[in-house]
Amino acid sequence: MFGMRLLPFLANAVILFNFAIGDNDAASLSGTWSSKSNQVFTGPGFYDPVDELLIEPALPGISYSFTEDGYFEEAQYRVVANPRNIGCPQAVLIYQHGKYEILTNGTLILTPFEVDGRQLLSDPCNDDGVSTYSRYNQSETFLSFDISIDDYHGIYKLQLNQFDGSPLQPLYLAYRPPMMLPTITLNPTATNDPTDAVGKGSVSKRSLRQIVKRNLENKHKQLATKKYSGILVSPYLWYVCTGVIGVGSALFLFS
């Protein structure tokens, strides 16, 4: 009988837990998210804006970072197999950052800084061993996104749904606060007015070098982790709910 009376409490506890982690807003979106390979991360380890270098990770994957005040960063390393010649895969590295907006209907829009996006395309069987390095600018629209606790890994999971509703591969929370390059225009284009090139929202090469150098020096000091502001957003609530369910089930079976 005690087990039967406990079941409504257990159900409410699980509902409360799911409600606590189900808010799809800028606060819950903030952080660095990485795909299953766990090898691709945004930040200075992927792109060096001073020397214009895209750094190839150990494995393909994608990563997105978001701040609470509306900035994003994107890192992609994709490899496409060549079915006609397995020794000729194509690979592409893509870096973008800029601003994002969450609409009232839950749509997520990413608008990159046009001059900062970079792409490195490698086609070893057709480019004579010389990869193509170019600017890249592609706005992105995600119809919706969902943040939850992954049932298998027990960590936060971000599911982005593309403009047509098809799901992107799931991303998992790697850092919070996010690991990102400065949220300003890193490589402003030259203008006739020298003050415009180092104006508001941009930095000079010298100051940019100092910023990136500091980020690199602090790379292994800023392994940010989730900060919990209360019991309702704590992962311990998951274990408490699981334990209570287990106890309730045992009492129900033996009552």
Swiss-Prot record:
The chain crosses the membrane at residues 231-251. It is found in: Endoplasmic reticulum membrane. GO terms for cellular component: endoplasmic reticulum membrane. InterPro entries: Rot1. It is a single-pass type I membrane protein. Pfam families: Rot1. PANTHER family: PROTEIN ROT1. Required for normal levels of the cell wall 1,6-beta-glucan. Involved in a protein folding machinery chaperoning proteins acting in various physiological processes including cell wall synthesis and lysis of autophagic bodies. This is Protein ROT1. It comes from Vanderwaltozyma polyspora (strain ATCC 22028 / DSM 70294 / BCRC 21397 / CBS 2163 / NBRC 10782 / NRRL Y-8283 / UCD 57-17) (Kluyveromyces polysporus).
